């Protein structure tokens, strides 16, 4: 499972070499959309899955299966500022226009995620792993619509990335929280080694 930012190419034709590299990796490859994946928008998921059938699976508005778990996911969205800080780096306030824009994007991503959960449940699955590119909460939040839907569907784990650099690794939930395991899998956080979500 790769949680986003697969290529810097803006068009599919510019990404083929990167996707071919991913194809050559061992095992089954399921891709989630990241904020840098400009070649892939929601309307293209179905056509990408048709073109790469049997080689790569693009996870958005659908679900994949591993053992007895349905794998659901979406890019997500997290408000990342700008924040206004005091001299000690404490947050005094933030840009409310940017926050409002982020809330609209969260609503859109939640619609996609709920559709994926619904499809998986209709297919008979009752165990879920939820994947996001962005972290499930911002540094201002303890909970969010993403943590709420994870609890609603009693997911086994929430797996996310996007947070890079030691100063950002603590931006969201890690470890056990309200009965759900939250895993940060950014490449630099893991030392560029795969993480085991399920045995």
List PLM regions with ranges.
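Conserved catalytic scaffold of divalent metal-dependent phosphoesterases
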Residues: 43-141
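Short glycine-/acidic-enriched loop or helix-start segments at secondary-structure transitions
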Residues: 11-13, 41-43, 81-83, 140-142, ...
